[in-house]
Amino acid sequence: MKLLKCNVNPGLLLATIATLAVLVPSSEAQGAAAGKHYEPTWNSLSDRRTPQWLREGKFGIYTHWGVYSVPAMGPNATWYANKVYWEPDSSERKHQEQTYGPLEKFGYKDFIPMFTAEKFNAEEWADLFQKAGARFAGPVAEHHDGFAMWDTKYSEWNAAKMGPKRDVVGELARAIKKRDMKFVAAFHHAEEWLYFPTFDKRYDCGDPRYSGLYGFIHEKNALPSKAFLDQWKGKIIEVIDKYDPDLVWFDNGLELITDSYKQEMLAYYYNKAAARKKEVVVTYKRNTLPPGTGLLDLERGQEADLTYYDWITDSTVDIGRGWGYVKGLGFKNLDNLVDNLVDRVSKNGYLLLNVGPKADGTIPDEARALLLGMGEWLKVNGEAIYGTTPWVTAGEGPTRLVRGEGDFNERNDLRYTGKDIRFTVKDNNLYATVLDWPGDRLLIKSLAPRWESWTGWSGLYPSEIVSITMLGDGKKLEWKLTEEGLSIETPKAQPCQHAFVFKIVRRKPF
């Protein structure tokens, strides 16, 4: 982003804008108070601001769980069936036929009786999400495969009538809301139009008897039909009416949906929320909805620097791109997950972390341990995450994200050091989170008081600082502020693991 040269600190300008977005009442609240009615036009829908609960909550969890959890084959479990039907030479097709027989005799639909979810317990899932420190959570309501995870009137191919024979979305909605978390419903079903080759009569996906699962039969390059678009919108509205989600998350595929259908869906959701006097948010992938109509989502990515706009990223606990459960797939370590949460929040972002449960409804032990580890870290350091806003700069340090612009730039090989620091602020407090143990002393160069001709004064002054402590320790630390920066003596013992928060209390609010 290019900034005009002026007598204003550009970092301060970004942080001020980001802070004002929190302090100004959200447009949902304003709209509800004024009795605003949204029209199905981009002009009417383009005044959305992120709800206060999301700006304060920062961290959420969602799940990819469905029929694709039965074969549990990677690299991407949720695209397994697509590869099986479309690519005869793919590893997925070879695995399918070697394990289950010819595709002509055993198709994707035949996994449904095996998707029994006999150990699924919505209360246990919600309890785990709460212990992990999540402030919002929920399931994928329907993925590209056409199998709905709620009791829908639009198709008999759903979890309430087949497979588990349980209303998974409904059970999770009740369990999550009971724990005062906001409820998330994720939709990926726009890409159902392209997911199966329904024109191919050799396989069950081309059989009209199974079109409720595989989708409307159409020619290879046909545009989405009115019947498909009506069903796409109808399913979302049904979930809104039945389960009242606080966040509706959209995957790629919205570019396939005609503008009028997207406009009608958004207007319905926002008007319903206003009638219910609640704040809601819709997320979207880049270039699929106009700016201002929802919140930008960066898949497995993050911004390189502090942004004036807020954003959310969806990432996953595994080291690849499995999303759903994949047998034998490795997991990230807790350092990586904690560091990524801290980094995103410092840059005006939020994290929606995915877990892929097994077909029986259990969450893998490795994933469970990671979530509980996140919760333990947040118990000590959540003060530097929840309810904070960005500072004038996201941070400092030698480790930089240099790949890509936002989407798919996540790096599992990124290793932060004891000199990598990320900043957040709340009230009179500046939180400097170090992404590895800094040793005996920490030097924060960004806090050196200095004058620059076109930015003015920056940093802090000794007279401004009331005290410095480390979260989890609480004892006042010795410090010295010089032209090199703020030098802080660290505690003798580490109060936690993974990342360490210095709380700098200032006499006046930031």
Each language-model region and where it sits:
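Intrinsic disorder/low-complexity segments
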Residues: 4, 22-24
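N-terminal secretory signal peptides that target proteins for export/translocation
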Residues: 1-8
